[in-house]
Amino acid sequence: MRITNQDKKQGLIEVVPETIDDLWHLSHIVEVNDYVSTLTARRIQDNNSGKTRADRGVKKKFFLGIRVEKINFHKYTGMLRFTGIIESGPEDLIPLGSHHTINVQLNNSIRIKKIWNKWSLERLNQAIEASNRANEIIVAIEDNTTELGIIKQYGIDYIGPIIGDISGKQNIEKNRAQKVNEYYEDITKTLTQQKDIDKLIIIGPGFTKNGYYNYLEENYPKLAKKVILESTGAGGHAGIQEVLKNGLIESLSKDAKIAKEAALVNKLLEQIGKSSNTVTYGKKQVITASNMGAVEKLLVLEDLVRDKNIQNIMNTVENMGGVVTIISSQHDAGQQLKALGSLAAFLRYPI
């Protein structure tokens, strides 16, 4: 994400989203009743012209602004839509007061006018700082099946499964070696479709991960230099979630947002499982703890951040020296926090 224009007095910031992560951030930065505008194009028909229908009309570009009523983000399609009432634009081309949906496009600027609270600005800065980071990819490999997990700001993008035709009595040793190489090559072709790979974390329960690493060393030495091997009790989604929870990703990258969130929620669940009196969850309980100054770390599901009452709790915790972490709802840890009421806290002392 890039900021291309800013007017602090007007509360106006113009940004250019560059990745799906940026669209996700924008879906939580923009709130209902905010004003957004972008350059749009419409073909204006000349009904008096003698031209054929296919030739009629001139495409005109203009800025159109709406007062936001509805926000929709779909991570799988990479689409972000703002729907609302048109407040600005050329009156001869568009009917003011009617409804319109703005489809936010990557690499196209969008203007946002709003009351920028601390949390909105922090989120915007997160998106800007993350824009230059390279990809970190988890390769969860087993004998016949591999899944890739692309680490995003909002969660994990899963690719796969990639299936290898290896097992079976009909595969004699020579044929098996060929099948293994074909399997490894299929994985690598999928991997190399991702740009700017920084780290490649190869995980799995057996020795297949070692075999794949040896294959990379021999055939793709530059890629092999980015590899970290890690044993896990499972492959697939379960294996990827395992390394997110065990702190490996967090230790490898100070910017691994999802890993930090997963580790915090996992620690919370462990403390709850032990019936610890130094954690609490649920809105009522957390409000009580925050008012007492007992909250050391506050976990807030991102879906709640627009709530002014929740913002007050967050401000109270920070003013009393606590740390606030906003948890994405797009990954497993976020769903676990949601099941606990979307709000939880680690306490300085029992209450």
Swiss-Prot record:
Gene3D superfamilies (alphabetical): 3.30.1330.30, eRF1 domain 2 (3.30.420.60), Pelota, domain A (2.30.30.870)
UniProt cross-references to SUPFAM superfamilies, sorted A to Z: Dom34/Pelota N-terminal domain-like (SSF159065), L30e-like (SSF55315), Translational machinery components (SSF53137)
Predominant location category: cytoplasm
Pfam families named among the record's database cross-references: eRF1_1, eRF1_2, eRF1_3
GO BP, one annotated term: nonfunctional rRNA decay
Alphabetic keyword roster: Cytoplasm, Endonuclease, Hydrolase, Metal-binding, Nuclease
Subcellular location per the Swiss-Prot or TrEMBL entry: Cytoplasm
Enzyme class (EC, first level): hydrolase
GO CC annotation terms, alphabetical: cytoplasm
Keyword DNA repair in record: no
EC assignment: 3.1.-.-
Function: May function in recognizing stalled ribosomes, interact with stem-loop structures in stalled mRNA molecules, and effect endonucleolytic cleavage of the mRNA. May play a role in the release non-functional ribosomes and degradation of damaged mRNAs. Has endoribonuclease activity.
Protein family according to the UniProt entry: Belongs to the eukaryotic release factor 1 family. Pelota subfamily.
Subunit (UniProt): Monomer.
Domain text: The N-terminal domain has the RNA-binding Sm fold. It harbors the endoribonuclease activity.
Protein name in UniProt: Protein pelota homolog
Gene that encodes it: pelA
